[in-house]
Amino acid sequence: MAKLHDYYKSDVVNELSKQFGYKTIMQVPRIEKITLNMGVGEAISDKKLLENAAADMAAISGQKPLITKARKSVAGFKIREGYPIGCKVTLRGERMWEFLERLICISVPRIRDFRGLNAKAFDGRGNYSMGVREQIIFPEIDYDKVDRVRGLDITITTSANTDEEGRALLAAFNFPFRK
């Protein structure tokens, strides 16, 4: 079991119960899933770019990504409905906890000119979204084998009802939020 999951069960649940006055531990917010999304708009002209992006995503997450397709045709972007234009991975359970641990402890500190994560990037329901500009911050990516630096979106879905609860949950995991 991941260290972060043990820490959640032993310390975070008690801490949040006291802070928000929950009556049962089932009311305490928890992380339900982490979604990684990588849009590869250039894949229209070169299919190899999407394969490389999917390989990077698989290395980062430890799971085979789902290829996302365009929902509708857009003439301005020269895409048609059904064209493969990106990939995504949904992490739950043990893989989710391991990824979160690597994200907080290893990857986020490797971001260039890092001054903390935006504490206002919550969606109103306690879910947190962040963007990463370079996939090379993850230790699983070999810098020499990268064909192109790509960014990805990371969404952390929680069972929190408010942004305040979600922020307290992530802050309990020592997320480096900007002051």
UniProtKB/Swiss-Prot annotation:
Subunit (UniProt): Part of the 50S ribosomal subunit; part of the 5S rRNA/L5/L18/L25 subcomplex. Contacts the 5S rRNA and the P site tRNA. Forms a bridge to the 30S subunit in the 70S ribosome.
Keywords per UniProt: Ribonucleoprotein, Ribosomal protein, RNA-binding, rRNA-binding, tRNA-binding
Pfam families xrefs: Ribosomal_L5, Ribosomal_L5_C
Among InterPro entries, the record links this protein to: Ribosomal_uL5 (IPR002132), Ribosomal_uL5_bac-type (IPR020930), Ribosomal_uL5_C (IPR031309), Ribosomal_uL5_CS (IPR020929), Ribosomal_uL5_dom_sf (IPR022803), Ribosomal_uL5_N (IPR031310)
Q: Which GO terms describe its cellular component?
A: ribonucleoprotein complex; ribosome
Q: In which domain of life is the source organism classified?
A: Bacteria
Spell out the PROSITE patterns in the cross-references.
RIBOSOMAL_L5
Q: Which GO terms describe its molecular function?
A: rRNA binding; structural constituent of ribosome; tRNA binding
Name the job this protein performs: This is one of the proteins that bind and probably mediate the attachment of the 5S RNA into the large ribosomal subunit, where it forms part of the central protuberance. In the 70S ribosome it contacts protein S13 of the 30S subunit (bridge B1b), connecting the 2 subunits; this bridge is implicated in subunit movement. Contacts the P site tRNA; the 5S rRNA and some of its associated proteins might help stabilize positioning of ribosome-bound tRNAs.
Keyword ATP-binding carried by entry: no
What NCBIfam families does the entry give?
PRK00010.1
The answer, when asked if Kinase is one of the entry's keywords, is no
The family line of this record is: Belongs to the universal ribosomal protein uL5 family.
Task: List the protein's name.
Answer: Large ribosomal subunit protein uL5
Mention one GO biological process in which this protein takes part, according to its record.
translation
